[in-house]
Design a protein with these regions (language model features):
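Secretory targeting and sorting signals
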Residues: 1-35
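Gly-Asp-aromatic-enriched flexible segments
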Residues: 538-685
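Carbohydrate-binding surface patches
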Residues: 288-291, 296-298, 334-373
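Aromatic-lined carbohydrate-binding/catalytic grooves of carbohydrate-active enzymes
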Residues: 74, 78-184
Length: 685
């Protein structure tokens, strides 16, 4: 869940006192912090999560707006959607389920308004549908949202959860009283508190999946949590932006050695159905499956699109995630534009993900040999999204659209060949110029003519024949050029052609699809086949008049903590700087960046910059504004003591404006930075 304590004074006595792990630590809370009877009882055997858990978590869609009806309706939806039959089991509550105080005996209790029948009844409802109930707590004095924490009540809370029939316990890392642990580093405190919680859960005698949500990667939970838990967070909370998905994926790249049956790296809840489009959701789901990550859906299961349901219930992809070997994927190659990830499966197959990180269609390739497969005359390449198998001589390649992934299951063919069609690839490369020199953004304009190159390649063991390649586009787009043909395309060779594509003069903003289609024959001409791929051309139109940035769609946005928020602060109220509230603006937490397309139409930007008043005098950031990659404003270090910066910068002729928020060199805690009333002055048409 998102932790307000990262930005407010909810964490009391937070002391940065080192990060070295002491190998031998006491396994219970200090007596001074533990009421009588709170020593964890002798532990029984630990529950084992042989494969990563699958289920649902409410936080990223509902936050604190949770209740009994939501949980029960979600359980019903998990059944009716086919998710239960696909392997999803856990229905997990996050923060805000509890009453604001414990009962007279010091026990946790569910909020009587949100859960009028109590948590035991909710658990019974979930169990009756063949599902399991998960719940949330915190090792600190309060949860991240300010509800009663487990500090000093660990065994009692574990017993309470067991008595309710809880099956999964997620324990967060907020409001930790570090002052009660003199001489210990934060990492040592984490090990101490979470070990005590692990013992308490085991001592109940009820198998409960233990999820550690110690969200500070500086404490390296992957080095100590495997011994005491079933999964552990490897990063901070994130949002549904593509860049944040990539950041969490990158965090996992060096951590494969720490995961395995019974203990899993947790890159956070799934954002499937919340991403910018279905392709991003499929790529995200592919990546989490490759990571052997917990598959905890974070969308509203009661109201999801057919595409979202199809993504979440793709059994071939789920089988990769749930592979019994439990070996997390490793990254074979990495650039800013593309990744290749490899995962070894229990039967010796390799799962291969070709991930396009960038904003344009890219050909990505590897080989069966590079994936670690034994030498063979041919390989079966199973596309886990298209549900089709092809035969390859060894190349594993695809033309992957922007923000997308191709996911394959690859195995050697025992007899060197099979009855599969040859693996082929079609690529389309519209050569759209950058928005400005050196930019990664490629934008087409109305009336512009774009040279587009398309190709068709044969990666199979034998040649294909009677090949023809053509390019088509949207209605109203002019395409000059004829289909290209060849009597045969041998293995490892390509057929290519060039077309001139003209964007209509009256086109509106959006992403437009160019399709390359190849027809051919295989199997000594006995079988006809078609292969195609799509590439998008992005058309943007700059703003007009005097809009606020917060009323426009950004090109990209990254944030150090959760998503960039529009016209509100983290806590839902207005942006506020030094007592002045603002109706319009952007809330960020360092390190953050936001880009907007201007198209050369705007002449100036005005804004008020400063730390949000919610951080109560803490935090420090820097602001930097650039136009087409050229710096036009630098704030220097900004603290709560710095007067509000009233910015007025020129933008004449700029295609793109970018605002960066830095951490001023002292970390990102409390770095809630507002970009208030950010207003453009642009041409009227």
């Amino acid at each position: 869940m998102i932790r307000p304590t990262r930005h407010t004074s909810l964490i009391t006595s937070l002391i940065a006192i080192g990060a070295a792990l002491v190998a031998t630590l006491a396994l219970a809370n200090p007596a001074s912090a533990r009421p009588l009877g709170q020593t964890p009882r002798a532990a029984t055997s630990a529950p084992v999560a042989a494969t990563p858990p699958m289920g649902w978590n409410d936080w990223y869609t509902f936050f604190c707006d949770v209740n009994e009806q939501l949980v029960e309706q979600t359980a019903d939806a998990m059944v009716s959607s086919g998710m239960r039959d696909a392997g999803y089991r856990y229905v997990n509550l996050d923060d805000c389920w509890a009453a604001s105080t414990r009962d007279a005996n010091g026990h946790l209790r569910a909020d009587p308004t949100k859960f009028p029948h109590g948590m035991k009844a909710v658990a019974d409802y979930v169990h009756a549908r063949g599902l399991k109930l998960g719940i949330y707590e915190d090792v600190g004095t309060k949860t991240c949202a300010g509800y009663p924490g487990s500090y000093g009540h660990v065994q009692d809370d574990a017993d309470t959860f067991a008595s309710w029939g809880v099956d999964f316990v997620k324990v967060d890392w907020c409001n930790v009283p570090f002052g009660d642990f003199p001489g210990l580093s934060q990492q040592q405190v984490a090990v101490k508190l979470y070990t005590a919680y692990s013992q308490a859960l085991k001592a109940t005698g009820r198998p409960m999946f233990f999820s550690i949500c110690e969200w500070d990667p500086k404490l390296r939970p992957w080095t100590w949590a495997p011994a005491i838990s079933n999964m552990w967070r490897t990063n901070n909370d994130y949002g549904s932006q593509w860049s944040q998905t990539l950041a969490n994926l990158d965090q996992e790249a060096p951590l494969a050695q720490y995961a395995g049956p019974g203990h899993w790296n947790d890159p956070d809840i799934l954002m499937v159905g919340k991403m910018a489009n279905d392709a991003e959701s499929r790529a995200h789901f592919s990546a989490w499956a490759m990571l052997a990550a917990p598959l905890l859906a974070g969308n509203d299961l009661r109201n999801m699109s057919a595409a979202t349901k199809a993504t979440l219930t793709n059994r071939e992809v789920i089988a990769v995630d749930q592979d019994p070997r439990g070996a997390q994927a490793t990254r074979l190659s990495h650039t800013d534009a593309a990744d290749v990830w490899i995962r070894t499966l229990a039967n010796g197959d390799r799962a291969v993900m070709l991930l396009n990180r960038g904003d344009t269609t890219t050909r990505i390739s590897t080989t069966a040999q590079a994936a670690g497969l034994p030498s063979a005359g041919a390989y079966a390449v199973r596309d886990l999204w298209a549900h089709r198998t092809a035969e390859s001589a060894g190349v594993i390649a695809a033309s992957v659209p922007a923000h997308s992934a191709a996911l394959y299951r690859v195995s050697p063919l025992k007899d060197g060949a099979g009855d599969y069609p040859p693996a082929t690839e079609v690529d389309v490369d519209p050569q759209v110029p950058p928005a400005y020199p050196g930019s990664d953004l490629h934008v087409a304009k109305a009336g512009q003519t774009i040279t587009t190159v398309a190709g068709f390649g044969d990666d199979g063991r034998t040649a294909v024949t009677d090949a023809t390649l053509n390019l088509t586009g949207p209605s109203g787009w002019k395409i000059d050029g004829r289909p290209v043909s060849a009597p045969a395309v041998p293995t490892g060779k390509r057929l290519s052609g060039t077309w001139q594509v003209t964007v209509p003069a009256d086109v509106g903003p959006g992403s437009y699809t160019l399709t390359g289609t190849a027809t051919y024959r295989w199997g000594d001409g006995a079988h006809a086949a078609t292969a195609r791929t799509e590439s998008t051309v992005r058309v943007l139109v700059g703003p007009t008049g005097s809009p606020y940035l917060s009323d426009l769609s950004w090109l990209s946005a990254t944030n150090g903590y959760g998503p960039v928020l529009v016209d509100k602060s983290y806590f839902g109220g207005p942006l506020t700087i030094h007592g002045t509230t603002y109706q319009h603006g952007l809330w960020t937490n360092a390190v953050a960046s936001i880009e907007y397309y201007l198209g050369g139409r705007c002449s100036r930007l005005t804004a008020d910059l400063g730390l949000d008043d919610s951080v109560q005098g803490q935090g420090s950031v820097t602001y930097r504004i650039s136009a087409d990659g050229r710096s036009i404003y630098d704030s220097g270090v900004v603290t709560n003591g710095t007067p509000t910066a009233h910015v007025d910068v020129p933008l004449t002729g700029a295609q793109v404006v970018r605002i960066d928020v830095g951490d001023a060199g002292d970390g990102v805690t409390y770095d809630n930075a507002d970009i208030a009333q950010p207003r453009l002055t642009c041409a009227d048409s």
